UniProtKB/Swiss-Prot annotation:
This is tRNA dimethylallyltransferase. One of its GO terms (biological process) is tRNA modification. It comes from Xanthomonas oryzae pv. oryzae (strain PXO99A). SUPFAM superfamilies: P-loop containing nucleoside triphosphate hydrolases. Monomer. Catalyzes the transfer of a dimethylallyl group onto the adenine at position 37 in tRNAs that read codons beginning with uridine, leading to the formation of N6-(dimethylallyl)adenosine (i(6)A). Its cofactor is Mg(2+). The lineage of its organism: Bacteria, Pseudomonadati, Pseudomonadota, Gammaproteobacteria, Lysobacterales.
Amino acid sequence: MPADQRPLAIALMGPTASGKTALALEAAERWNGEIVSVDSALVYRGLEIGAAKPDAAMRAAVPHHLLDLRDPWQVYSAAEFAGDARQAIAQIVARGKLPILAGGTGLYFRALLEGLSHLPEADRAARASIAAEAEQIGWAGLHSELARVDPVAAARIHATDPQRIQRALEVYRISGRPISYWQALPPGLRLPVRVLKVVLAPRERAVLHGRIERRLDAMLAQGFLAEVEQVRALPQMRAVAVPLDLPAVRAVGYRQAWEYLDGAGSLAEFRDKAIQATRQLAKRQLTWLRGELDARWFDPERDRHQLERALVGFLGDRSAVRQASGV
């Protein structure tokens, strides 16, 4: 199908706390859209406050997809996401509505928009072994090991990104080939829609840091720690030998809350650790987004008129986009 005849979709990308949720809701109301979540934390039931999951009122106003797909003791892969998202997008297009992809999980976006390389499946035993090594030598030490066996991947993966270090070493150990080899293979089927990629990101780092801090404080006031206590109390979670290895618990904020509730440090120390971890996540997200050469960048507060023109130019005119909040 020629590119100019494919159905339209927009991808609202950006670091955490940059305003994607608010803009997605506005765009859905204005252009008769439905929102497809591209967030690896929002797929888990019970992760509400700490994941900034759209509330009941938002979900009643605009249809949302790919929320609450798994329980927190389960695993959900990028390949599963790509298949589920492709199906949701096809259904949205069939209804004559606009698919709005909104989130900040780079692996999910790449899997959907570019296709996945043929990576080996996850291996629980290999992951457990790598996690045990991290307890002994630290993730920086494992990053050094990765640099020896796969310098290409090590150059892309930061030493403070344990999840990607673990996955890269896991792939190497179970397949005998570096993850960069698998990632260089031709990707799978690409998405048959024409997508405008929009990146929301404050130009000043201090602005984003302030939004992150204010959002965490709001989450704490809303009962974030009580939410984590509820997840911890689930019988299936109590049966997990190492819950910190679960993707749901590794989500930023949840991991630090889990460790705090295990007795690690004071409440103030937990808050500082959660803010720092969220800043590191935002930094990694911005690094990934800079590689999206066909994306249009906008400051969520300063570039409202430019953003308006970009969306209208791609989708057609409707009433003006309102000022986005910091969700």
